[in-house]
């Protein structure tokens, strides 16, 4: 697969760059909206969390399924797989990952950040990430194909660029959240629950509205003032008590589709 894919809106006011399926740039009217890899904060610019969200350390890295117990590290094994390109046009691209049930995958967090060397999952799945850059927005669609009844959690983890002055706010419904408030959330992130829409409001530059289908919740996370992760999630995992209880999991319908639309304004 070509490491870099560059898409352009039909009116040429926006472009998107993807590196091995990772969203590394979204330029709108020459303004960069995505956190740049190598800058302080986070070493990535986006990733997907599947089939779990959050840490499994509290459960000794074990996740219980109807087919038994399997090792999973933080945010699941999907990130350990490589994307291939299914098709591409000027303003669209479809990436795909496939996993064969029970395949042991090397955990990239081992040994520096995790004692678990291999992770696995007892279900086949195909995971598609479709990118469509329109004149007004960036649409990202996730399609998960697997057997009916598979438990799963899904989260999308993009990082957006901030100006470093901590004067941006996040709004959702009647809630207004500052960057310092989000930072106090630490590694468990700041939950914004039971909503499908959220906005990043800036003093300078383009604001962002994020609308979703299928997720219904968000987490906000940043270790720095120059970036912010606004993460659509199916469930907030840091609920106290037993981690990753079965109530946090969706149950597959065979094919499940989730959407994220990012609109600069």
List the predicted regions and their residue ranges:
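Internal active-site segments that recognize and position negatively charged phosphoryl groups
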Residues: 139-143
């Amino acid at each position: 697969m070509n490491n870099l894919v560059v898409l352009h809106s039909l009116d040429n006011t926006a472009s998107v760059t993807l590196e091995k399926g990772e969203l590394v740039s979204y330029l709108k009217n020459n303004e960069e909206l995505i956190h740049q890899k190598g800058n302080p904060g986070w070493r990535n610019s986006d990733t997907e969390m599947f089939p779990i969200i959050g840490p499994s350390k509290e459960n000794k890295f074990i996740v219980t399924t109807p087919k038994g117990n399997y090792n999973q590290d933080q945010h699941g094994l999907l990130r350990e797989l490589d994307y291939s390109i299914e098709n591409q046009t000027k303003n669209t691209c479809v990436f795909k990952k496939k996993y064969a049930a029970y395949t042991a995958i090397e955990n990239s967090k081992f040994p520096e950040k995790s004692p678990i060397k291999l992770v696995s999952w007892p279900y086949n799945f195909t995971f598609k990430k479709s990118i469509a850059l329109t004149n007004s927005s960036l649409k990202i669609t996730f399609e998960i194909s697997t057997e009916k009844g598979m438990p799963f959690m899904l989260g999308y983890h993009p990082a957006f660029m901030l100006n470093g002055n901590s004067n941006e706010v996040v709004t959702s419904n009647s809630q207004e959240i500052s960057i310092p408030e989000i930072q106090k959330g630490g590694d468990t992130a700041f939950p914004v629950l039971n909503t499908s829409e959220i906005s990043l409001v800036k003093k300078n530059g383009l604001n962002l509205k994020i609308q979703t289908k299928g997720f219904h919740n968000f987490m906000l996370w940043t270790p720095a003032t120059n970036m912010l992760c606004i993460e659509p999630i199916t469930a907030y995992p840091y609920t106290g008590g037993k981690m990753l209880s079965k109530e946090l999991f969706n149950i597959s319908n065979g094919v499940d589709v989730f959407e994220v639309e990012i609109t600069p304004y």
